[in-house]
Amino acid sequence: MDKLIITGGQRLDGDIRISGAKNAALPILAATLLADEPVTVGNLPHLQDVTTLIELLGRMGVHVVIDDRMNVEVNATTIKELTAPYELVKTMRASILVLGPMVAHFGKASVSLPGGCAIGSRPVDIHLRGLEAMGADIEVTNGYVNASVDGRLKGARIVMDVVTVTGTENLMMAAALAEGTTYLENAAREPEVVDLADFINAMGGKISGAGTDTITIEGVERLTGCHHQVIADRIETGTYLIAAAITGGRIKTKDTVPGTLDAVLQKLEEAGAKITTGDDWIELDMQGRRPKAVSLRTAPYPAMPTDMQAQFMALNLVAEGTGTIVETIFENRFMHVQEMNRMGADIEVQGNTAICRGVEQLTGAPVMATDLRASASLVIAALAASGETTVDRIYHIDRGYECIEEKLQSLGAIIRRVPR
């Protein structure tokens, strides 16, 4: 497996371009299955999960053309196979997203239960109950979800008992072609959900209320072609801002959406960063200062994203003072703590709370990535450590960060990838 070798102690300085958001790209690629005409999607990040979903579409007989700039044209009318097989689905939980659009457009779907991250339980029950409420017959046998409907799905009022991003997206896609109106209550409000709604509306859908906790979908008989650019990745943006902050540096992130990062920027200002924003850029300057410890609690958007928790923990490792981090979204999401402590961190975990006491200096060590955001946090910690850190199992990083070592090198980091 590839490794990253990082020599810490360099102050980051420079400008980088932010990639398209993986968490918007995946549902949008799934939603191409709803259209009766070819659709084009641009600004896709060049990531393993995106490639896997494109491969899944191709395996099902969907006509996919991709250029060297990651613009994809998809024509779902050529679909031959309504099954998403285990060997592709096992690596990525987002593959469950093809269930809603397939049953809505083609009347049936068979999707293997997904794999992906190792963090906690992510039940798909909400997706299945919602589809049943819209008239689908659902059977789970031998690890596959088999869904079918006679005619069209029917609009329904669906109250989700917990806020779920993929659940909201799956049901929103299914409802786009249903007969009648669907109301999704307790819906996820994430910008990626809004981007998916914008994409469906560009194809002729009638979705309103995306970005609030009640989404209204008036079903239409067919969806047509369109061109759509995926929104910028707010988590990638936040990760690079923290990487600059931990080194006392300066960074300008370009082609991003500052309005999607209010909770993150507020905490960075608390840590002592000077933040300036424009329409599509954010500049952070630590002016060589050591960060101050911050306390935070993860919660659904627009609050602090769980996907930024590990990165803020890394910042706290070398900060002045003590910060407390409470994880409310996923269980078992402190797997990076053990690895950070190998670098000389002082972290104590009590249930879903981590208490981080800042130390003067971290020391480079061999560490192992356990999930996507944990691996990014280990890279951030390594940038501030003295000596050399080796981060193993970085296939986790490659699932969510496009060219991470190249972007960090352009900011002055000493980092290289060593192939297995």
Curated annotation (Swiss-Prot):
Cell wall formation. Adds enolpyruvyl to UDP-N-acetylglucosamine. The modification 2-(S-cysteinyl)pyruvic acid O-phosphothioketal is found at residue 117. Its main location: cytoplasm. Disulfide bonds: none annotated. Belongs to the EPSP synthase family. MurA subfamily. One of its GO terms (biological process) is regulation of cell shape. It is found in: Cytoplasm. It comes from Alcanivorax borkumensis (strain ATCC 700651 / DSM 11573 / NCIMB 13689 / SK2). The active site is at 117 (proton donor). Keywords: Cell cycle, Cell division, Cell shape, Cell wall biogenesis/degradation, Cytoplasm, Peptidoglycan synthesis, Pyruvate, Transferase. It catalyses: phosphoenolpyruvate + UDP-N-acetyl-alpha-D-glucosamine = UDP-N-acetyl-3-O-(1-carboxyvinyl)-alpha-D-glucosamine + phosphate. UDP-N-acetyl-alpha-D-glucosamine binds at residues 93, 307, 329. This is UDP-N-acetylglucosamine 1-carboxyvinyltransferase. One of its GO terms (cellular component) is cytoplasm. Its EC number is 2.5.1.7. GO terms for molecular function: UDP-N-acetylglucosamine 1-carboxyvinyltransferase activity. It is an enzyme of class 2 (transferase). Phosphoenolpyruvate binds at residues 22-23. InterPro entries: Enolpyruvate_Tfrase_dom, Enolpyruvate_Tfrase_sf, MurA_subfamily, RNA3'P_cycl/enolpyr_Trfase_a/b, UDP_GlcNAc_COvinyl_MurA. PANTHER family: UDP-N-ACETYLGLUCOSAMINE 1-CARBOXYVINYLTRANSFERASE (PTHR43783:SF1). Pathway: Cell wall biogenesis; peptidoglycan biosynthesis. Gene3D superfamilies: Enolpyruvate transferase domain (3.65.10.10). SUPFAM superfamilies: EPT/RTPC-like. CDD domains: UdpNAET (cd01555).
